[in-house]
Amino acid sequence: MKFRYSLPCLLLLVVMLTGCGHNFDSSGYVTSIMDTLYKGNYTSYMDFTGVSRSDVSLYRDQWLTSSAEAFMTAFGAGTPSEETTDRIIALLNQLYANASYEVTAETPASDGSPQTVQLSIRPLNILKDNYDAIQVYVHSFNEKNAYFSYADLTEEAYYDTYLDGILTILESHLADMTFGEATTLDIPLEKNSDGLYTISEDTLTAIQNTLLPWPETDTQQ
């Protein structure tokens, strides 16, 4: 498969990623969204929208769960135990805490084009840097599986065992994680029929794939 991060439909899109008002601070608003999703810092977003801390926290928890599910899918894994899912979420939280991004420019709406913010992102290279080690592990796992080494495991335990090897590799390299060259994305802010500014799901996925890029490979579990 092509290792590619593709977020499923996010429950938080309609409520969370909206803003309105005159003299809209698009740079601050986009930064507040990034801070909420990646840093767990809700203060600015709450100031923009008036959404309660408990609601924003719930939306972020849902987003992290979706992120964990996308992680499993990217590595060809089915549903593991709750403990392994929590471990994936904990890893993602540690990765996202290191996210580096900033708004570098704004382009006002004109001639039918939406208002746009330029967002500079430095990619987290942990997946690319450790791809070879992960590939060796997956190959070894598949060889053992071919000889029925995991035949006595339940499906849940099977995926726990498979994901444990990948998570162990990534967790052991959190301290020496490197960053890629900054990449700038255009983030359109479009008004919906209610006059609310929104960021599309495709744009959120593009941000995610830029911040945490996957190596392109045809190898899977």
Q: What does each model-found stretch correspond to?
A:
Residues 1-7:
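Bacterial N-terminal signal peptides that target proteins for export
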Residues 9-13:
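Aromatic (Trp/Tyr) and acidic
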Residues 16-19:
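C-terminal motif of bacterial Sec signal peptides marking the signal peptidase cleavage site
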Residues 21-101:
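Core segments of small alpha/beta cavity-forming domains
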Residues 41-44, 124-125, 195-197:
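Primarily extracytoplasmic ectodomains and periplasmic/lumenal surface modules that are beta-strand-rich
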Residues 76-163:
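Surface-exposed, charged secondary-structure patches
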Residues 138-152, 157, 161, 175-221:
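Short beta-strand edge/turn micro-motifs at domain boundaries
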Residues 165-168:
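Exoplasmic/lumenal beta-rich domain surfaces
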